[in-house]
Amino acid sequence: MEAVRPDSCESGPAAPRAEERPAPEARVHFRVTRFIMEAGVKLGMQSIPIATACTIYHKFFCEINLDAYDLYLVAMSSIYLAGKVEEQHLRTRDIINVSHRYFNPGSEPLELDSRFWELRDSIVQCELLMLRVLRFQVSFQHPHKYLLHYLISLKNWLNRYSWQRTPISVTAWALLRDSYHGGLCLRFQAQHLAVAVLYLALQVYGVEVPAEGEAEKPWWQVFSDDLTKPIIDNIVSDLIQIYTMDTEIP
């Protein structure tokens, strides 16, 4: 199977800026990762397992043509596999029922008939395929622990009034969660993503870091020495594209 290397799969400091308008593939992946996130929440998954499921999904389609397999089957298998990787094990029956209700709101759970067992077997077989395609490399370093550390540090820098009157922390976490709609988790380092969402959250509310003008280097470089402004700009640009798709896709 010929591998595909879309922009969202490129990694490293020199990752290219996103195009002005999201590619059709990006819109498809947006829909499917939105399903992963919503299904994950209904299944009671924590933020890290959901992030892992999205990353597995994105990484798989960096190796496989978009039309080679059913996207939502891959998504369900990504959820199932992520639960194992992050030790939040999920039953295939629950994944199937949540997915069924996602596409058929108000419907009853599927009967344990041949259709159910065929779907269950498909999820398990797809999981094995994904493990082989990804060469069993399904553990990832996520930005969450870095963002938590950076938020604690920033809270100590800012005055109490600035911190309490603006939802910087809530916004940064929301930006990080939404970044998994795209391939940012593959294109950029975890530390860089964590700093960039914090940078954007501060920009949104017009909050300035104290003594920024007198410091030898910007606050964001204190958190990550190899981070540059162009990398931050690239991440912010990709995030803006994600929110643009969110307004355009029903």
Swiss-Prot record:
<comment type="function">
    <text>Activating cyclin for the cyclin-associated kinase CDK10.</text>
</comment>
<dbReference type="InterPro" id="IPR048055">
    <property type="entry name" value="Cyclin-Q_first_cyclin_box"/>
</dbReference>
<keyword id="KW-0195">Cyclin</keyword>
<comment type="similarity">
    <text>Belongs to the cyclin family. Cyclin-like FAM58 subfamily.</text>
</comment>
<dbReference type="GO" id="GO:0043410">
    <property type="term" value="P:positive regulation of MAPK cascade"/>
</dbReference>
<protein>
    <recommendedName>
        <fullName>Cyclin-Q</fullName>
    </recommendedName>
</protein>
<dbReference type="InterPro" id="IPR006671">
    <property type="entry name" value="Cyclin_N"/>
</dbReference>
<keyword id="KW-0007">Acetylation</keyword>
<dbReference type="InterPro" id="IPR036915">
    <property type="entry name" value="Cyclin-like_sf"/>
</dbReference>
<dbReference type="InterPro" id="IPR043198">
    <property type="entry name" value="Cyclin/Ssn8"/>
</dbReference>
<feature type="region of interest" description="Disordered">
    <location>
        <begin position="1"/>
        <end position="23"/>
    </location>
</feature>
<dbReference type="GO" id="GO:0006357">
    <property type="term" value="P:regulation of transcription by RNA polymerase II"/>
</dbReference>
<feature type="modified residue" description="N-acetylmethionine">
    <location>
        <position position="1"/>
    </location>
</feature>
<dbReference type="GO" id="GO:0000307">
    <property type="term" value="C:cyclin-dependent protein kinase holoenzyme complex"/>
</dbReference>
<dbReference type="Pfam" id="PF00134">
    <property type="entry name" value="Cyclin_N"/>
</dbReference>
<dbReference type="GO" id="GO:1902749">
    <property type="term" value="P:regulation of cell cycle G2/M phase transition"/>
</dbReference>
<dbReference type="GO" id="GO:0016538">
    <property type="term" value="F:cyclin-dependent protein serine/threonine kinase regulator activity"/>
</dbReference>
<dbReference type="InterPro" id="IPR048053">
    <property type="entry name" value="Cyclin-Q_second_cyclin_box"/>
</dbReference>
<dbReference type="InterPro" id="IPR013763">
    <property type="entry name" value="Cyclin-like_dom"/>
</dbReference>
<dbReference type="GO" id="GO:0030295">
    <property type="term" value="F:protein kinase activator activity"/>
</dbReference>
<comment type="subunit">
    <text>Associates with CDK10 to promote its kinase activity.</text>
</comment>
